[in-house]
UniProtKB/Swiss-Prot annotation:
Naturally occurring in which organism (per UniProt): Arabidopsis thaliana
Modified residues (Phosphoserine): S542
The keyword Nucleus appears for this protein: yes
UniProt family annotation: Belongs to the actin family. ARP5 subfamily.
Official protein name in the record: Actin-related protein 5
InterPro entries for this protein: Actin (IPR004000), ATPase_NBD (IPR043129)
Length: 724
């Protein structure tokens, strides 16, 4: 099996005789393994397993313990997160446990597949028989160990400190571990499991709570708050408050003591480079680049225009040639002749030639030629095309009167088209004249012309956006101070007028004499009351046309110009907070109230939604559960309370626990809370001293015993700690 490890493999495994036991402290956080009789474990690592794939070969490898960050580039860990063999503090994933034991025995120096040393392994208090039996089966069947013994880690820590005079033979051990907390009373040096208690709260929850609080407080830096970093911050900054309520009040009032108790964590920060104003040479260089880009764009546009003119000239030549061929064809055969060309008649072909000719003249910059019908004298136009216009009605027949009305309508329409064409021609001439003047100004001073054009564009854009806002929100007299937008403020002017007319028509119904319709103006109300009237406001106005012209012009002469989309100006012109550059203060993590708020869950688990008792109440629960009610025994127990486990390293733990227990005990009861010499390693050291005793094998059981007595026998199995 391929292992990835940074732990050095031991080389003296074969020097130990088979009678020397191997001691394992199988904690939910860390796995420790070593030899009996020694004071330090040989191998220590995180009790987790990862099985990522190697990016190059695709092989699945096993990583036990923490992964070296420098090796992350070689493995794909996205599909395989860290896995623990524990559920709370009970081993239930024995496949993961086998990976961990394989790795531990390999790092200890074991060769081959068998382990010929007795094993003492720790477990939690009141471990379920299913977990205990499967662990024994794994050690016997997979590794072939000769004998196995199970012991409680907190009990080994208590007995080890009892040997060194830290605690007495009667007392209570409180062990806030990684995922759970246990309270076990000791009477005459032996644990009384009937009086033990457990809560599902531990150091993991403290670390996770700190990680969540900091991520909510600094969402910009949430990726920095990894679980490992939160664990380091907990060990470095967290403490137990003597009085949680008063400590909270201290920070709420912002006293000087609160500032002194605040810690800081400075994240790496690199100041942004200072912006140096461009030199005159740089400005000139950029202007030359812009001019060069503008010239290239103009050349591209000119080449495109020439290509378009050539295409239209070729099209016009082919159309005129086709028209000559049509002239040589009989009138009845023209539709058949034109069937393959896409034209239905001679008139359609001539209309196409006229349109192409007009487009060609426009592309060349020449003035358009008006159709012949508009170049004629208006008098001859009236006399020839509309002969009935000047004839009196009294001498015309009914049919001629109808023709006269039709001719009058056609004449009015033709005159309207003529006026529209003349107006368009005048506008085009004015536009060409204006373009020529602007081009002359641009050639004289390009920089000044560009700045002026940009200012005009911004001004027109603001007017257009203002009109759109007025159409959306309606007019306001400035008396609305609430800042809200109700239905009346959202209606446009046309919609409000229509609502007024509808309301007036409804309330005026039946009042007085109804004379509606006697005047032609009355019928205009239907148009005003129609919803289609709202679309009139949506027609493009002169400002929008001017905006389009300025935008097109800026795109021609300024390659860096980006046209603003609709609504962008309204977003930027509102009261939007200005984005300031990030400073060193933005990368400083302030850890104030979190220092004692997170560890407080050990005493009040309800802060994170766990409805269980805290550490101080657990001690009282263990005393009440004892089978004999003796006051002297209770006093002996409270006078020797040992704190062990990783969370007992938090500053202020002993004082807070003693204060909490004193509140639930009778007045004058002796209370003494002490901390283990090494809350982290004393469990392994106690187990090592126990396994080194000559009577160790009397507390262990062999595979033969396991096979003969069965799984139920392990239910009542318990070692005698007084041998230590």
């Amino acid at each position: 099996m391929a292992f990835v490890s940074r732990i050095r493999r031991q080389s003296d495994y074969n020097t130990y005789p088979s009678s020397i036991p191997i001691v394992i402290d199988n904690g939910a956080s860390y796995f420790r393994i070593g030899w009996a009789g020694e004071t330090e474990p040989r191998v220590v690592f995180r009790n987790i397993v990862q099985r990522p794939r190697h990016k190059a070969t695709g092989e699945t490898v096993t990583i036990v313990g923490d992964l070296d960050p420098s090796m992350m580039k070689y493995f794909d860990c996205t599909r395989s997160g860290p896995r623990s063999p524990f559920d709370s503090n009970v081993v239930y994933q024995f496949e993961i446990m086998e990976y961990i034991l394989d790795y531990a025995f390999d790092r200890l120096g074991a060769n081959g597949s068998g382990i010929d040393h007795p094993i003492l392994i720790t477990e939690c208090a009141c471990n379920p028989v299913q977990s205990r039996s499967k662990m024994a089966e794994l050690l016997f069947e997979t590794y072939g160990v000769p004998a196995v013994a199970f012991g409680v880690d907190a009990a080994f820590s208590y007995k080890y400190n009892q040997l060194h005079g830290i605690c007495k033979k009667d007392g209570i051990v409180l062990c806030p571990g990684f995922t759970t907390t246990h309270s076990i009373p000791f009477v005459d040096g032996e644990p009384i499991y009937k009086g033990s208690s457990r809560t599902n709260i531990g150091g993991y929850h403290v670390t996770d709570y700190l990680k969540q609080l900091l991520s909510l407080k600094y969402p910009f830096h949430s990726s920095r708050f990894t679980w490992e970093k939160a664990e380091d911050l907990k060990l470095e900054h967290c403490y137990i408050a003597p009085d949680y309520a008063s400590e909270i009040r201290l920070f709420q009032e912002g006293r000087k003591e609160a500032e002194e108790k605040t810690s800081y964590w400075q994240l790496p920060w690199i100041p942004p480079p200072t912006e140096v104003p461009p030199s005159e040479e740089e400005i000139a260089r950029k202007a030359a680049i812009r001019e060069k880009q503008g010239q290239r764009l103009r050349e591209m546009a000119e080449a495109k225009r020439v290509s378009k003119i050539n295409d239209m000239e070729n099209q016009l030549i082919s159309l005129r040639f086709l028209l000559k061929q049509v002239d040589q064809v009989e009138e009845d055969d023209i539709p058949t002749f034109l069937s393959d060309t896409g034209y239905a008649s001679r008139q359609e072909l001539e209309s196409t030639i006229t349109k192409v000719t007009q487009s060609l003249r426009k592309a060349r910059g020449e003035p358009k030629n008006e159709p012949a019908e508009y170049e004629e004298n208006p008098d001859s136009l009236n006399n020839e095309k509309y002969p009935l216009m000047n004839v009196p009605d009294d001498i015309l027949t009914p049919e001629q009167l109808k023709d006269k009305k039709r001719q009058m309508f056609l004449k009015t329409t033709a005159e309207g088209r003529l006026r529209a064409r003349q107006k368009r021609n005048e506008e085009e001439l004015e536009k060409e004249k204006r373009n020529q003047l602007e081009e002359e100004r641009r050639r004289e001073n390009p920089e000044s012309y560009l700045e002026e054009l940009q200012a005009q564009y911004k001004e027109v854009l603001e007017r257009v956006e203002q009109k759109k806002r007025l159409k959306t929100n309606g007019s306001s007299n400035g008396n609305n101070k609430s800042g809200g937008i109700g239905r009346g403020e959202r209606l446009s002017a046309a919609q409000r007028e229509r609502m007024r007319l509808l309301t007036t028509a409804a309330f005026d119904r039946g009042k007085g004499e109804d004379t509606f319709g006697s005047r032609d103006e009355d019928w205009q109300l239907y148009k005003l009351m129609s919803k289609d009237n709202d679309d009139d406001d949506e027609q493009p106005d002169s400002d929008e046309a001017e905006l389009a012209r300025l935008s097109s012009r800026l795109q021609e002469i300024d390659p860096t110009f980006v046209q603003k989309v609709e609504g962008e100006l309204s977003q930027t012109s509102g009261e939007v907070p200005r984005v300031r550059p990030l400073t060193e203060e933005d990368y400083k993590i302030v850890i104030g109230i979190e220092r004692f708020r997170c560890p407080e869950i050990l005493f009040h688990p309800n802060l994170i939604g766990i409805d269980q008792v805290g550490l101080d109440e657990m001690a009282g629960t263990s005393i009440r559960r004892l089978p004999h009610d003796e006051k002297e025994l209770e006093e002996r127990l409270t006078s020797s309370i040992l704190m062990t486990g990783g969370c007992s390293l938090l500053p202020g733990m002993n004082e807070r626990l003693e204060c909490g227990i004193r509140m639930i005990r009778p007045c004058g009861s002796p209370i003494n809370v002490v901390r283990a010499m090494d809350p982290v390693l004393d469990a392994w050291r106690g187990a090592s001293a126990f396994a080194a005793n000559l009577n160790f094998l009397g507390n262990a059981f062999t595979k033969m015993d396991y096979d003969e007595k069965g799984e139920d026998w392990l239910r009542n199995y318990q070692i005698r700690y007084n041998y230590l």
